[in-house]
Amino acid sequence: MTEVEQPPQNGIDPTAGEDDDNSKARPADIEQDMREMERRKRVEAIMGSKLFREELERIVDSARDGGAGASGILQQLSDIVGVPVSRVGSVFKSSNCMVPINDIRGVESMGYAKGEKILRCKLAATFRLLDLYGWTQGLGAQITARLKVDQEYFLVNPYGLLYHEITASALNKVDMQGQIVEQGTTNFGGNKSHFVLHSVVHAARPDIRCAIYIGCSPVVAISSLKTGLLPLTKDACVLGEITTHAYTGLFDEEERNRLVRSLGPNSKVILLTNHGALCCGETIEEAFFAACHIVQACETQLKLLPVGLDNLVLIPEESRKAIYEQSRRPPEDLEKKFAAVAAAEDGAATAEKDAAEAVPKVGSPPKWRVGGAEFEALMRMLDNAGYRTGYIYRHPLIKSDPPKPKNDVELPPAVSSLGYLLEEEELFRQGIWKKGDIRKGGDRSRWLNSPNVYQKVEVLETGTPDPKKITKWVAEGSPTHSTPVRIEDPLQFVPAGTNPREFKRVQQLIKDNRRADKISAGPQSHILEGVTWDEASRLKDATVSQAGDHVVMMGAASKGIIQRGFQHNATVYKAPYAKNPFDNVTDDELNEYKRTVERKKKSVHGEYTDTDFSESEAVLQAGTKKYPQSEPETEHQVIEIQTQQAPVPRQAEVVLSDALVSQLAQKYAFLYSPGQYMYACMKMAPLMHKVYVIHKVEPVSKHNYPPVNDGNMSIHHNESGAGFMAQESSVISSTPVRNALASVSLPEERNHSILGLSSTPYRTISHFGFNCPLITSPTILLHPEHRSIWQRVAEQREKVVSFIDLTTLSLDNRKLLNVVTSTHPTQCQSQSQSFISEKHIQLEVTPPKRKQRVYSATISSGLDDSLDELDSLMSGLAINMPRSREQDSGLYRSYTFLPSNHALPKDTDANNRDQTDRERPEAEQEESFHCAGDSGIGDSTGRRPRLATTSNDSSIQEAEAYTQGKHVKLTLSSSPTPTATQSPATIEILINVSLRNAECVQTVQTHEQEFRAKLERVIDEEIHYISQQLAFKQRQAELHEQQTTSRAPIATPSFTTMHPPAPASSSSMVHRSNSAPELCHTYSYVAVGDLSTKQDQASPQLPAEGEPLNDILSSLEKELERLLNSVVTAHMLHNKAIIHECRARFSQLADGIVSS
């Protein structure tokens, strides 16, 4: 029997512990009826198919027009419905047209008795098996089967049909005398002479329900022997007791008695002399089991007869009994079940046993049938071959149905044709018909079949003078339908992993609340039943005295106690209605009254004290005006919701207190008083100055120079101090100090006030406390984590400016200082170009001895702090460059930039390239590459992109050239002509750029020109700043002279791009102090004025030779080195550059100081 499909229960079996009717076995006839119902549904679906009907009509019409008979039409139908003969032609010897065995379809099965259809199918299948095995001899053989034990009706094959033509509906039903009780679907009757043999056996042995006559050649040959069938093989032993009868063919009363005596009470196989054998059994399966084995045993014995009977070895009697009992025993897995059933039936009566054998007990395991497994396997073979046996399998081949695809939403065939199911037979087994279980799916099917299109209907109430509108939803009667949702799984929309017991628990709680009468009708309605709107408005405005004069009969009802179809009949009772005397009381008054009562309850002795009043009460009072609707005081009321964002400080703000001013003044005294640092170097006592603010280095894109203010800073001189102090005071007054007020003792006659650039310190949002925007330093783009390098750079700048102002430029030389201004100040160059001419910045090869000094030089402290970070930055550079050959990284450890005019063996390509690069101006050379800005070394082409493609000889020569020390030489000359480089006061800055590994070598070789431009831009910004400071001091001195000689007012120096100059005459304008630094490509010293006029104000001459001068020069060289190293370190960390060391030397500074 097939297993009944269990619906999914989401992982939990709700029927655990309950009796499951599906686990009990149904009777065979009921199970067969259920299967036939499913098959009838299939047949009805196919017969109702439009495609199948059209195909049948086409076949019939074509056959009728062609003149073919009914046999041709049936043949074509068999070809359509059946399967090709070639599928089973190799299995059996004969291959005929496959006529279906089970041809009882539709309502025809209802005309047969209970279980008769199954027996017909089995018997017809047995005829088909005998035909396929070739054990038939024309029309003479017969197979009979008893329908019931208590009835003498038998099924026999009609005389005139071959075995392969017999179907289930073609069998005739006859009685014990051979009279036809029920004719089959054919016109053939029965053969009474052949049926006599079967009738004698059935009459003598009621336990035999099937008899098969075997008249094939091997069986007839063995039945003709005197010895009969010998126990030579296992096939002969499983037959049990075999009897022999001298059959003559004529049956009279004496012959029947001898046949009964020959058969005996136990034997089920009898050999008919010279005619064959008659195999009997309690079931059709057992009779066919005996027929198969007797044919095999006879064939084996015939093959052994030529050796002689004396040479044959017979199986002993004990072994034969053991083999016979083993063949009747069920398999091991079913033997225990059968033993339990047998033990339970030991105390039952014989009649009850017979009844139990006839009708299987519900819930008991199926009885084992001898030969049932072999017969069922043969039925599967016939079904697979397309014979359609109709056999009911007791042990299905497949345990359960394969898994089906499940979707959340499916489209069921609500109104559709079933023509597409013609070839899809699996859909019939898995379709909606299998789900139509009436016992369990009654409510569900009714819900699924409920209408899904509704119409909104509004019904007026009855029984009230002011009826309300009741909304109802009724099913729409139109034939249009929407798309329904097919639900295969009852838990289809339930989330996975949930427990259905939780739902049942909540459901039980809801029921308990309902039983406890805890469910109310909800909020009370303020709409008065039976009162019109005019009357309601009058009642609302009526006074208490007038309320008694107006009585209204009201009707009220709860919808919860009215049936769904009678909700519009709202009137249940009527009662007089009077005006509520508290209707005139507002919500605010009620809330205030409730709060007063609550406060009085909280008082200790009953006296009212307003101690609980708070600011929140005022908020509540303000909220009641905005929201007049009252709510219960026990619930929280939301007055107002505002969304704000807490302010997040941009940076930590540190405000300097007055107590720290003196400490900071001492710590940073060298920044605001350069003379103090000079006296420290010259072993003089330092001067104390008062500091007001701390300067902040702003990271801006370019320099801007604010206008000069008047009268904001004054320097007072005292009588104490003379001589060299005069020079120092002038230096201090001309040095841009961050709002420092210096008091120096000078002669009284030199007491004067000098105009300076100053502004009142003011508070800013900066975390430095105060800010004074006097001037901005050059741009250094640096990561915020390296913010300390900015301060170090600013400190070194101040030191260098102070040293240059005090030592390298005396009072006379400073009067000669001025910046060459451009004749076209409105022109502006691109910021990406360099501001230093190539005539002043040259890349040269230094001698080997200089190389050793540069390599042995110590690295600055600022660079030592960032070497580890530099290695990590360089390792992160993903540069894929082709390499000509592997080279030792130690060769390029101190490798630096290759100058544009480096000395190499001149070949044609190198000579042309060097000559071209040297003759081109710098602006054109910079256009040959693209600067990457602040993102590091970009994807630009350098001066030597052919290093990877040159020959080995040239590569070796270039490597030898690169191993030498290379320096960037920056010259500050005192003459505007570039050729005058040997004049006094010349500063040379040598910058050594070295590499650390071979990978950096290739990077520099590729991006040499780009990196040079970046380096020039860095140096240019520093020189801009230094020259601006020096020019500013000179302008202060000129302003002082103009003030003493009553000259015209000085024009305000301004930055070109930010403050364009106003038109004025040449007499009222003076030279700008580098007001357009972007246009200045040379920084030189030009003579303005008479040198002799200032000789009397000169300071005492410094000694030409001596220890102080050497100390000053060495200190200045160190300070300039630190400045350049700090600047380079800052740019290296931001641009991922690889500058290693910067050094400065003063080639002709000593001669210039001595000559001055």
UniProtKB/Swiss-Prot annotation:
For the keyword Phosphoprotein, the answer is yes
What processes does the entry annotate via GO biological process terms? actin filament bundle organization; adult somatic muscle development; axon guidance; centrosome cycle; cystoblast division; female germ-line cyst formation; female germline ring canal formation, actin assembly; fusome organization
| Keywords carried by this UniProt record | Actin-binding, Cell membrane, Cytoplasm, Cytoskeleton, Developmental protein, Differentiation, Membrane, Oogenesis, Phosphoprotein
Q: How does it sit in the membrane?
A: Peripheral membrane protein
| Pfam families recorded | Aldolase_II
PTM Phosphothreonine: at which residues? Answer: T480, T498, T609, T611
Q: Subcellular location, in the record's words?
A: Cytoplasm, Cytoskeleton; Cell membrane
Residue ranges annotated as compositionally biased, kind Basic and acidic residues, are: 22-36, 904-929
Give the modified residues of type Phosphoserine.
Answer: S478, S603, S614, S630
Q: In which tissues is it expressed?
A: Isoform C is expressed in nurse cells. Isoform A is produced in the nurse cell but transported into the oocyte at stage 1, localizes to the oocyte cortex at stage 8 and to the anterior pole from day 9 onwards. Isoform B is expressed in the somatic follicle cells that surround the germline.
Q: Where in the sequence is Phosphotyrosine found?
A: Y608, Y627
Q: Name one GO molecular function term.
A: actin filament binding
* Region: Disordered, residue numbers: 1-36, 897-956
Q: Which GO terms describe its cellular component?
A: cytoplasm; cytoskeleton; female germline ring canal inner rim; fusome; germline ring canal; lateral plasma membrane; plasma membrane; postsynapse
> What CDD domains does the entry give?
Aldolase_II
The record, for PANTHER family, names: ADDUCIN, PROTEIN HU-LI TAI SHAO
What family is this protein classified in? Belongs to the aldolase class II family. Adducin subfamily.
Role description: Required for assembling actin at ring canals in developing egg chambers. Probably interacts with other developmental proteins involved in nurse cell/oocyte transport through the ring canals. Important for normal neuromotor function.
* Note in the entry: 'Hu-li tai shao' means 'too little nursing' in Chinese.
Any idea what this protein is called? Answer: Protein hu-li tai shao
- Specify the species: Drosophila melanogaster (Fruit fly)
